[in-house]
């Protein structure tokens, strides 16, 4: 990943970098990889996330 610094504005470049990392889910992945997650726990978490996405999608479809 590459961020360009314009006019020596490093603070803005850092904000842009943080936003891109957040959008790609890198912070969440680092947090999850900090400790070992058993396969059964990982599977349950993924199922829960899928259900959450499905509910969100259904809400969005209901509004439209």
Swiss-Prot record:
Keywords assigned: Ribonucleoprotein, Ribosomal protein
Highest rank taxon of the organism: Bacteria
The keyword GTP-binding appears for this protein: no
GO cellular component: ribonucleoprotein complex; ribosome
Region: Disordered, residue numbers: 37-64
PANTHER family: MITOCHONDRIAL 28S RIBOSOMAL PROTEIN S21 (PTHR21109), SMALL RIBOSOMAL SUBUNIT PROTEIN BS21M (PTHR21109:SF0)
GO molecular function: structural constituent of ribosome
InterPro entries: Ribosomal_bS21, Ribosomal_bS21_sf
Keyword GTP-binding set for record: no
Protein name per the record: Small ribosomal subunit protein bS21
Family the UniProt entry places it in: Belongs to the bacterial ribosomal protein bS21 family.
Biased composition (Basic residues): 53-64
GO biological process: translation
Gene for this chain: rpsU
């Amino acid at each position: 990943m590459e961020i360009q610094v314009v006019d020596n504005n490093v603070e803005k470049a850092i904000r842009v970098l943080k936003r891109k990392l957040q959008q790609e889910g890198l912070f969440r992945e680092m947090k999850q990889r900090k400790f070992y997650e058993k396969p059964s726990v990982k599977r349950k978490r993924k199922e829960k996330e899928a259900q959450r996405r499905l509910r969100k999608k259904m809400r969005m479809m209901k509004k439209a």
